[in-house]
Amino acid sequence: MTSLSSPAATPHRILDRYDALLVDLDGTVFRGGAPVDGARDGLSGRASVYVTNNASRSPQQVAEHLTSLGFEVDAADVLTSAQAACTLAASLLDNSDGSEQGTRSTAYVVGAASFRGLATDAGFRVVDSADERPDVVLHGHSPENNWAMLSEAALAVRAGAVYVASNLDTTLPSERGLLIGNGSLVAAVVSATGVTPHSAGKPGPAMFGVAARQLGAERPLAVGDRLDTDIAGGIAAGMDTLCVLTGVSGHREILHTMWRPTWIAANLRDHLEGWTARQDGDTVIVESGATGGVDVMAAEALAVAAPLVWSADDRGEDLTVVAASGDSAAAEALAAWR
């Protein structure tokens, strides 16, 4: 990728328009055990809450992991879908005796030990079996989730427990590629019970609202790599959004998506000035500006072409995106679209 040492690349001015960033983690800030290029530079010194659908780690564990990768983060800067699931579950349960929400309720947790701890902290009594007739099943991602746990969850849900999933992401980005996400295992319980869970995480708007209030933000920007969760959730919350091309969603998916981000970028740092696009009949012609790393050029080409294609899609028209005649940089950028 182009680095700031390249004279062509400049820091994003997009981020300066906002007073807080609500930032996804997997695929946006890091992939597995490695930081995404540009993320540390882009986020440095900015008010941020890390809003993650990953429920397998506690806020403290997430903060420690980010710190080990060179980010300046406290546990208070992290909002996980496990936290959101506990809050949602408490609000769904009927505490007709007037007790504090969740205080007298029982929960069966499919997920990490940290999720069980968060449920306990939220006032739930965590049980180990469907035979104890839990009031709610809380389902979050953990590498330790197995057939026995999913079966207990299915038994509890069939017996009437409220079913709350931390998130419905079907895949989880890693350095090796896309792994099975929480939504894929939730689908097994849904198949066995016929019950669709309440989902606490993205793409619902709740997490974004909580994160913005946490910072007292008036102009928050939702940032992520997935259209169907990060961008859809930000849109649902009524916020501007930035889709970075460092994770799941690719250029061609963004070009024809129903979840249209306000901004598109290669990463949280690098930007190339001067790229333009214009419509000529049924063609969008991209002209290059400043040149640099091909991934950054590809993102700039998409950023200027996408609004024209979206408008055409709304009119029922089909446009083809091409490089301007003789523009080798634009041609290279479009060839890199995935």
Q: What are the residue ranges of the model-derived segments?
A:
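Asp-based, Mg2+/Mn2+-dependent phosphohydrolase catalytic module
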Residues: T2-V23, R31-G33, A63-A76, Q83-R338
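Receiver (REC) domain active-site loop signature in two-component systems and cognate sites
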Residues: G27
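Catalytic-core regions built around general acid/base machinery
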Residues: D37-A47, E152, A156
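Generic structural signal for secondary-structure transition and capping sites
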Residues: A47-S48, G194
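Short internal beta-strands
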Residues: V49-N53, V164-S166
